[in-house]
């Protein structure tokens, strides 16, 4: 063990992963988290890694970008993905978790680590440059610290408006109407589906558009812009009569056996719903259900009224209503190196959603990289970048100054980006079939990361300070 302590500010997904990686490298960590003493507009607990939006980490299959990212994280023994696997709930082809058990387990694991010192205080300023620090405060960074970050960077923060979906009690839905199925019968029938005919859909859309919105502060109204990957359902409804039907309410691939023979074309065309609202388990028992894709800024009374129009949800009881909040992120291409160090202070790192990555697995990946590099710096080594061929490497390259694409686009400001196969380098041999090409990307990534990990293991083990905690 070495004496130099690394400070990690924020115990969300990125901060939790970073703290775990650092401590397991034999480096002491001070993990600073302001909750529960000071909360945010979206959090409800003081637990680490609380999931405030969806409970899904995205597709599991490695021929999907999110699935490859999860696979890469497993190679590096990611605490976040290990914990997600342990508390997974059925979600078809996706990795979804019981959010309460997930965050409770993260908190317990980190609290019991001998090299992690937890401080439940609000961080009001950036530590001095003598301290190795990881900024993992997330999109809901407190105002005081956000102002200090702006002073340090000299750049106003970027922001967008994000929203969370409502959660309802599973025993309050009508199972005579709602049916269980996964799209195209992929995996277990993990979703509950509320079918709508054309009249029901049209009425529901009209009510959504006319529904009364929760108030935004004046400064928020002036600069309101939504993140396209997490639009409020009422905003989607306003974009066109069929926009919801080709988005979160699409019915294709979903079939209730009560409707008869799926392979009878006439029957299929006659019985197929005009739209379907999906519900996903929040816990293994299905006592709590998330309304998939139903992020909203409707007033709570309007949510209860309008969402009860949905067939099968006429008597729905709400555990949590949807909320909208302002998310802050850095203009990373102008500020960060691919190692996630700040260009103007290499002892300071940023990780997670504050860097402009989108999605839970991507946040964990940022924490993983920042944690590894903070450990290396603490040991007197040089920070590393992940291979370009990996999803982690390509994503971090894209948000950093190493990739000039975003910073050179003066008309289009930098916006959060999810993992995507469009970010990774092309294969040397062209593969026309998309699925086969993505599988080839996956195999290439695994191959290069296994080599990369062996090199890292050598660096961490050469002074015999690597700590392994089961």
Swiss-Prot record:
SUPFAM superfamilies: FAD/NAD(P)-binding domain. It catalyses: uridine(54) in tRNA + (6R)-5,10-methylene-5,6,7,8-tetrahydrofolate + NADH + H(+) = 5-methyluridine(54) in tRNA + (6S)-5,6,7,8-tetrahydrofolate + NAD(+); uridine(54) in tRNA + (6R)-5,10-methylene-5,6,7,8-tetrahydrofolate + NADPH + H(+) = 5-methyluridine(54) in tRNA + (6S)-5,6,7,8-tetrahydrofolate + NADP(+). Its main location: cytoplasm. Its EC number is 2.1.1.74. It comes from the Bacteria. It is found in: Cytoplasm. Gene3D superfamilies: FAD/NAD(P)-binding domain. It is an enzyme of class 2 (transferase). One of its GO terms (cellular component) is cytosol. Keywords: Cytoplasm, FAD, Flavoprotein, Methyltransferase, NAD, NADP, Transferase, tRNA processing. This is Methylenetetrahydrofolate--tRNA-(uracil-5-)-methyltransferase TrmFO. The lineage of its organism: Bacteria, Bacillati, Cyanobacteriota, Cyanophyceae, Synechococcales. The gene is trmFO.
């Amino acid at each position: 063990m070495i004496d130099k302590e690394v400070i990690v500010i924020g115990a969300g997904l990125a901060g939790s992963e970073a703290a775990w990686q650092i401590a397991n490298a034999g480096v002491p960590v001070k993990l600073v988290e302001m909750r529960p003493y000071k909360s945010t507009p979206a959090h409800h607990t003081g637990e680490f890694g609380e999931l405030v939006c969806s409970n899904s980490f995205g597709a599991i299959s490695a021929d999907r970008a999110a699935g490859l990212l999860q696979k890469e994280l497993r190679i590096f023994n990611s605490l976040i993905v290990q914990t997600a696997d342990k508390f997974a709930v059925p979600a078809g082809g996706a990795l979804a978790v019981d959010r309460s058990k997930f965050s409770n387990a993260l908190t317990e694991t980190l609290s019991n680590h001998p090299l992690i010192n937890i401080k439940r205080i609000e961080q009001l300023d950036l530590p001095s440059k003598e301290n190795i620090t990881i900024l993992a405060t997330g999109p809901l960074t407190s105002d005081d610290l956000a102002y200090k970050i702006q002073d340090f960077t000299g750049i106003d923060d970027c922001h967008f408006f994000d929203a969370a979906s409502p959660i309802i009690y599973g025993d309050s839905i009508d199972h005579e109407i709602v049916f269980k199925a996964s799209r195209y019968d992929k995996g277990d029938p993990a979703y509950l589906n509320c079918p709508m005919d054309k009249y029901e859909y049209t009425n529901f859309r009209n009510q959504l558009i006319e529904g009364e919105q929760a108030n935004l502060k004046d400064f928020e109204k002036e600069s309101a812009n939504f993140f396209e990957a997490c639009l409020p359902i009422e905003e989607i409804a306003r974009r066109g009569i069929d926009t919801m039907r080709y988005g979160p309410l699409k019915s294709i691939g979903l079939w209730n056996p009560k409707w008869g023979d799926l392979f009878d074309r006439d029957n299929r065309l006659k019985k197929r719903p005009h739209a379907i609202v999906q519900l996903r388990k929040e816990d293994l028992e299905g006592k709590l259900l998330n309304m998939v894709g139903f992020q909203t800024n409707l007033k709570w009374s309007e949510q209860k009224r309008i969402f009860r129009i949905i067939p099968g949800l006429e008597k729905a009881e709400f555990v949590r209503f949807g909320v909208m909040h302002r998310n802050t992120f850095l203009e990373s291409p102008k500020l960060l190196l691919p190692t996630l160090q700040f260009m103007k202070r290499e002892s300071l790192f940023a990780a997670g959603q504050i860097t402009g990555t989108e999605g839970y697995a991507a946040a964990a990946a940022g924490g993983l990289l920042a944690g590894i590099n903070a450990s290396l710096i603490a040991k007197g080594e040089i920070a590393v970048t992940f291979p370009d061929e990996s999803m982690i490497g390509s994503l971090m390259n894209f948000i950093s100054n190493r990739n000039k694409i975003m910073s050179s686009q003066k008309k289009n400001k930098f916006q959060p980006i999810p993992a995507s196969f469009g970010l990774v380098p092309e294969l040397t041999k062209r593969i026309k079939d998309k699925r086969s090409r993505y599988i080839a990307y996956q195999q290439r990534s695994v191959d290069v990361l296994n080599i990369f990990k062996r090199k890292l293991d050598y660096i961490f083990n050469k002074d015999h300070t690597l700590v392994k905690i089961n």
